[in-house]
Swiss-Prot record:
Family that this chain belongs to: Belongs to the UPF0158 family.
InterPro entries referenced in this protein's UniProt entry, alphabetically: UPF0158 (IPR005361)
Protein's recorded name: UPF0158 protein CT_429
Taxon lineage: Bacteria, Pseudomonadati, Chlamydiota, Chlamydiia, Chlamydiales
Region of interest: Disordered: 292-329
Organism domain of life: Bacteria
Originating organism: Chlamydia trachomatis serovar D (strain ATCC VR-885 / DSM 19411 / UW-3/Cx)
Pfam families attached to this UniProt entry: UPF0158
Length: 329
């Protein structure tokens, strides 16, 4: 069994980056979290075969070092959307429309598109998604016996955070870092409490609605000293400093890409109207078949004849107008 360096304090993990990895893990991409240093890397089929062979060999030889991040199942995705609609949406018509979308094909993308047409519901979704994702990640880390602290939860200076990463495996450090390590150890125990998985609702009267100002989290640089050379080109290092940058979409990697799609492509309402028009057209074809136009050719003639009749009605009117003009002259 391979022996690995032992970290001298809980691993500093970025919860927003983990949320992004959890949402992007699918049939084409596998994400892994390192137990030794806490870095994330992912494997997809776009990489060179030689590099893929090397990283798979690394995973096989050091299987106990890396944890495969779980993939969202179809049931879990549907459950997330249904829970949000039932718990957070109060308008009956809007709720019915959301539930209709949840049951449809390609529900995940349609759900987001419809959501972005309702600003109030969008803000509630963002908060709901972050809270539920955080609980899911903490539960997974606990089940895999990680000792960790989310960097976004700390009030340390950037310098201290980076020094903790540089000296992660050093037993002897300065007094300042020794104190910081003790604070990290105390903080890490909070994630193993019951409240971490069941946050208490805030008591008292809700605050007055005001303009929402989202402060970006100050994060330190990525400093990893024990990354195997074969894993370096697979590292997952997105710079996510606010929850609004996260996306639930399975087709787009960032919120900016998804919004660009909404601005450039057709809206959900247009797609629904097109679907309704298509259904009515099919019903008309069925009706024509019942009237005796059963074959494909006859069905086509039925529509063509109707169109020709309209043209014949228009032509006499044009000749009449021309005749009047000549008589006046």
């Amino acid at each position: 069994m391979t022996t690995y360096p032992v970290p001298q304090n809980p691993l500093l993990l970025r919860v927003l980056r983990l949320m992004d990895a959890f949402s992007k893990s699918d049939d084409e991409r596998d994400f892994y979290l390192d137990r030794v240093e806490g870095f994330i890397f992912y494997i997809d089929l776009d990489k060179d075969q030689e590099d893929l062979d090397k990283i798979y060999q690394e995973l096989e030889e050091n299987a106990d070092r890396y944890c495969l991040i779980p993939k969202l199942t179809f049931y879990e995705i549907k459950k997330i959307m249904e829970t949000f609609v039932n718990e957070k949406i109060y308008d009956i018509d809007t709720k019915e429309k959301f539930l209709e979308i949840v049951q449809s094909k390609n529900a995940r993308e349609q759900f987001l598109e419809f959501l972005y047409d309702h600003e109030t519901e969008q803000e509630k979704w963002q908060q709901f998604y972050v809270e539920r994702s955080r609980i899911r990640i903490i539960e997974w880390l606990r089940n895999n016996q990680f000792q960790f602290v989310f960097e976004e939860d700390l009030d340390f200076s950037k310098h201290i955070l980076e020094q903790l990463k540089v000296h992660l495996f050093d037993a002897k450090v300065s007094k300042e870092l020794t104190q910081a390590r003790q604070l990290l150890l105390n903080k890490s125990k909070v994630y193993y409490s019951n409240e971490a998985l069941n946050p208490r609702p805030k008591r008292g009267r809700p605050p007055k609605q005001s303009a929402k100002v989202e402060a970006e989290t100050t994060i330190s640089s990525d400093i990893y000293t024990k990354v195997p050379s074969v894993a370096r080109r697979f590292l997952f290092l997105p710079e996510i400093t606010s929850p609004s940058s996260l996306t639930f979409s399975e087709k787009f990697d960032t919120e900016e890409e998804f919004l660009a799609h909404l601005r450039g492509g057709g809206r959900l309402e247009d797609q629904l109207n097109l679907a309704k028009f298509s259904e009515r057209f099919d019903s008309l074809r069925e009706l024509s078949a019942k009237l005796g136009y059963d074959s494909d050719g006859e069905t086509g003639d039925f529509f063509d004849e109707e169109y020709d009749d309209e043209e014949e009605e228009i032509k006499p009117k044009k000749t009449t107008k021309r005749g009047r003009k000549k008589s006046r002259s």
